[in-house]
Amino acid sequence: EKMHIRPLTDLIHKRGGVIMLIKIEAIVREEKFEQVKSALQDIQVNGVTISQVMGYGTQRGYTEIVRGSEVDILLHPKIKFEVVVSSEEWEQKTISAIQKAAFTGEVGDGKIFSYEIRSAVKIRTKETGYNAVQSQDNL
């Protein structure tokens, strides 16, 4: 299923005349996958990478009975969403959409991180920076 492609040229963040890219990583509960994916589609993000990951934070591990024995499970299955945007406005809009969609109020809801990207290269076309992440076609 393709995400809707939306030009980002109306909302861009520049530093020294160069468009700055911001990467947002969100690690959320597996059961929130569809809600977060839909929230990102609703705000028309330009693209997203989604991965299944394992980890723990304040939630820590838990004990489970496996074949009659107690086993400590240290890592929890999670879903990681990665989105690249080109403005602080889009950064806040994206974080807000993810936070709202992923929220349960319980320990283990996840984390959202954002940081500036130093460089980006589209392998197929050799485009760099903003042009590397701005889709001009559906290929």
Model feature map: region roles:
Residues 4-139:
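Positively charged, small/polar-rich N-terminal and surface patches that mediate targeting and assembly
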